[in-house]
A protein has these predicted regions:
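Residue-level hotspots within the lipid-embedded alpha helices of multi-pass solute transporters
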Residues: 23-27, 60, 100, 104, ...
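Transmembrane helical elements of multi-pass membrane transporters/channels
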Residues: 14-33, 136, 170, 199-203, ...
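Small-residue-rich hydrophobic transmembrane alpha-helices
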Residues: 45-105, 144-163, 258, 269-335, ...
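Helix-terminus/linker motif at the lipid-water interface of multi-pass membrane proteins
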Residues: 27-46, 115-124, 180-187, 248-281, ...
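Small-residue hotspots at the loop-to-helix junctions and early N-terminal turns
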Residues: 42-53, 130, 134, 193, ...
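Short alpha-helical transmembrane segments in multi-pass integral membrane proteins
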Residues: 1-19, 73-140, 182-241, 297-363, ...
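N-terminal transmembrane alpha-helices
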Residues: 4-35, 39-40, 56-68, 72, ...
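Short runs within selected transmembrane alpha-helices of multi-pass transporters and secretion channels
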Residues: 66, 136-155, 163-174, 192-207, ...
């Protein structure tokens, strides 16, 4: 008798397409931000791009906590324990609130010191842009943490359409606000920061209100959010802390290599910023697939069904290779037309073209196995392995080799991006070997027991 699958193709697509749209909106609005602020000048675009590297480090902290909550909640649902799933959802929101407020306070107090530490060689004009943008966006961190927690709760139930609809509202406010503040009110760098703060606050309020509805299966209540239970919190942090350490160190590594790039001046900083925007387009499907992998594999692990864990991991990886490859090919084919949307000097544009070619060309073959596959391991509680591999690879290749190529050999931004590709290859070798060996199963059994 043929075994019944936990997810049909229709259910997988229902989970995936809202995630893809949500990622697409986030990336496209981010691109629009960069295009708008580029009209203010290259000092402005440099300031925003540098602070966004630090902001991305903070965002990964919130994302790691949300991943921990999503894994635990999905596993409870897979094991047919809805009450425990609802409990973990409430605890996730409470932890998110604490983390968001704490991180915001830390960043506001140390913002000048952080910028001097990471980007001490930048001009005064760029530093002023950094300070303005960092101060305003730091105020939005509590709202972002709460939004991430709420979105993770809905994804755990397979209802990613909710977070997508809220994302449409959030990004709509952000885009319209940017246009108003930059072009009409002439607010400069602050014009792309204030709408970010407002939109994140609105998004957090909406998604938490939806999660608190009486008819929602994982309904959060004031009691579930504020009364922490050691066992549930420990389960969330068991996944969240290694993920936070891994992802935050990864982003810190990105900040440090950008500080290397900043040694080569505004042209390299601006080209790197634009290239990061365009690279993100090629990763839209992959990022969505990574989020879906958490939900799907978490359910399989909760049900202790390792055959279906293998089946869905391979299936989602195949889908990602096909879809992400197609998107990257399109970006490369129309790269010159896309770059023409930015206000760049010829030298900056030429360097941005080279960087995008390196990233998007290689990601067709390397990105899914390097970044989507480890989410399957995380959903199976194999978080320590992914943390060790990702951290070691980042330190040795993304940072160490970047220093050699970028600074010692004078290759600038191009050297950093070559080192990034080597980092991807190392990650793939380790993660594929781990998955194929089946060594991850011992952690899945131990935590589910």
């Amino acid at each position: 008798m043929k075994k019944e699958r936990l997810f049909t193709n229709r259910q997988l697509l229902t989970l995936l397409w809202p995630l893809i749209i949500e990622q697409m909106l986030e990336i496209l609005v981010g691109m629009a931000d960069t295009v708008m602020v580029s009209s203010v000048g290259e000092a402005a675009i440099s300031g925003v791009s540098l602070v966004d590297m630090i902001n991305q480090l903070i965002i990964t902290l919130f994302g790691a906590l949300a991943t921990g909550g999503a894994v635990v909640t999905s596993q409870h649902l897979g094991a047919k324990r809805p009450e425990d799933a609802a409990k973990s959802a409430g605890q996730l929101v409470g932890l998110g609130a604490i983390l968001g407020v704490g991180v915001a306070a830390f960043c506001l107090i140390t913002r000048t010191a952080q910028l001097r530490l990471f980007f001490g060689t930048i001009t005064d004009e760029v530093m002023q842009a950094c300070l303005t943008y960092f101060t305003i966006t730091a105020l939005s961190f509590p709202f972002l943490a709460l939004y991430n927690a709420g979105a993770a709760i809905f994804r755990s139930t397979g209802n990613s359409a909710v977070s997508m609809k809220v994302s449409v509202i959030v990004n709509g406010i952000n885009f319209c606000g940017n246009a108003l503040c930059v072009f009409v009110l002439k607010m400069g760098v602050a014009g792309v920061a204030v709408p970010t703060l407002i939109s994140r606050a609105v998004g957090a309020c909406i998604i938490l209100a939806l999660a608190a509805r009486q008819d929602y299966q994982l309904r959060i209540t004031p009691q579930s959010v504020t009364r922490f239970e050691g066992r549930t919190v420990k389960s969330i942090l068991y996944i969240g802390i290694p993920s936070a350490f891994e992802n935050s160190l990864f982003q810190l590594g990105r900040v440090l290599v950008v500080s290397m790039i900043s040694l080569f001046g505004t042209v390299h900083i601006s080209a790197n910023a634009v290239a990061n925007n365009l690279d993100a387009i090629g990763c839209i499907v992959g990022n969505a697939m990574g989020l879906a992998m958490i939900t799907v594999i978490g359910r399989c692990i909760g049900a202790q069904d390792f055959e279906q864990t293998n089946y869905y991991t391979k299936k989602l990886l195949l889908w990602d290779y096909i879809a992400q490859g197609a998107v990257n090919v399109v970006v490369l084919l129309f790269l010159n037309q896309i770059l023409s949307m930015y206000t760049l000097t010829p030298e900056t544009r030429a360097l941005a073209w080279t960087l995008v070619m390196i990233h998007n060309g290689m990601s067709i073959f390397l990105w899914p196995a390097s970044f989507v596959l480890p989410n399957a391991l995380r959903a199976a509680n194999d978080v320590r392995f992914t943390m060790v591999v990702a951290t070691a690879s980042m330190l040795v290749w993304r940072m160490g080799l970047s220093w050699v190529l970028c600074v010692q050999m004078g290759m600038g931004a191009v050297g950093v991006w070559y080192a990034m590709v080597v980092d991807w290859i190392c990650r793939i070798i380790c993660f594929v070997a781990r998955f194929v060996s089946g060594a991850w199963k011992k952690n899945a059994v131990k935590k589910a027991a």
